[in-house]
Amino acid sequence: MDSISTAILLLILALICLLLTTSSKGKGRLPPGPRALPFLGNLLQLRSQDMLTSLTKLSKEFGAVYTVYLGPRRVVVLSGYQAVKEALVDQAEEFSGRGDYPAFFNFTKGNGIAFSNGDRWKALRKYSLQILRNFGMGKRTIEERILEEGHFLLEELRKTQGKPFDPTFVVSRSVSNIICSVIFGSRFDYDDDRLLTIIHLINENFQIMSSPWGEMYNIFPNLLDWVPGPHRRLFKNYGRMKNLIARSVREHQASLDPNSPRDFIDCFLTKMAQEKQDPLSHFFMDTLLMTTHNLLFGGTETVGTTLRHAFRLLMKYPEVQVRVQEEIDRVVGRERLPTVEDRAEMPYTDAVIHEVQRFADIIPMSLPHRVTRDTNFRGFTIPRGTDVITLLNTVHYDPSQFLKPKEFNPEHFLDANMSFKKSPAFMPFSAGRRLCLGEALARMELFLYLTAILQSFSLQPLGAPEDIDLTPLSSGLGNVPRPYQLCVRAR
């Protein structure tokens, strides 16, 4: 192709992009925002190294609701508790769609529970929630599994004999085993290759998606498919995870008894068989594989990452750690492990866990939503199909909701009588129709794991508490904690 033809082609592409970015003007008044360039959108005003800060800065200029173009894709951004609550809670149905997120969607193709839409999403979510509840989510049966796994974790911590270690894989193996036992029917030994592979693939992909490479891939996926970089490992890892899950599914198929389902996979396979003759069924092999992947990812990374943040915070603020231990000793003692029933008598511990989740803010921007119809919102018109990013970080750090949002302060969740106090601006699991499916399980795990560990051990940093750096290693999809080591000393 000669230079003139190339120039003409580029001009045509630029005009198409310009038309796409301006085609909404006839559909009502979009929220304001910075002027966008063809193809690039607002890329020059955003820093891929710190997308969250860039988007938050724009909200100070254009308000709590504004429009930005991530490449050629139009996105409405919501900032602050009030705007996010009005969208996700007050207008839950309109904002219930799942927006474009190529780093996930190009793998799931809309077949998993996290990235499906419409009737498929509703069917998968309803049935998956039913299965999880049948296998004890939020009930005593799942609590018993967590307590059992807690015993194994405590034994692993004792083996460190007070020497420095990185808690990442020690914690992740235990946490992942909870969701694995629900999905696959049994827990793994801590040295099982399948468990170690699951954790490695999930941790690496979470770090890549939270990096500048992950941010850029979500803006220009078709372009970056041809560019070398760490983002290329995303889909290799996805493929390995899919093969691992498929292997387990084949094992389940060979021994399936529809009248006695052992786990999530058995239940899903039974549903597939029941609807095999229905060409419109949403239950087929790809939805099983992708939904299983979504549950493994959420059930492993969310709690594991939160606990790693919690350990650092408790070491940096040892007075908080001591106060939690005193409450554990007073309410539970040392003769048994804490249970969920104890939480009601432990307001300070409950407040600390909530404050860890607020302060660590492990999913600062949430996954994108999408409006399901033309939507009137705060005097603006958001066209159907528009993606919406909710800056959950600005909810958790909203000064109208938290007295000292930039400080780690458990009293954000305590009233004047030192009783636990809920906050409507507490949204670590998002809010509305896309609320995290495993919220109840995650909350139970965080309480039982943290109290069991602090009942038996004190967490000690390798240096001075004031030298602990709480800034994340990267901040994109998630706030990834920096690698660190600690010592656990038996109490």
Curated annotation (Swiss-Prot):
Q: Which family does it belong to?
A: Belongs to the cytochrome P450 family.
Which residues bind heme per the record? C436
Cofactor(s) essential for the protein: heme
Under which name does UniProt file this protein? Cytochrome P450 2F3
List the keywords (alphabetical): Endoplasmic reticulum, Heme, Iron, Membrane, Metal-binding, Microsome, Monooxygenase, Oxidoreductase
Q: Does the keyword Iron apply?
A: yes
GO CC annotations on file: endoplasmic reticulum membrane
Cite a single Pfam family from the UniProt record.
p450
Q: Where in the cell is it found?
A: Endoplasmic reticulum membrane; Microsome membrane
SUPFAM superfamilies (UniProt xref) = Cytochrome P450
- Check the record and name the PROSITE patterns matching this protein: CYTOCHROME_P450 (PS00086)
Membrane topology annotation = Peripheral membrane protein
Q: What PANTHER family does the record point to?
A: CYTOCHROME P450 2F1 (PTHR24300:SF275), CYTOCHROME P450 508A4-RELATED (PTHR24300)
The organism named in the record is Capra hircus
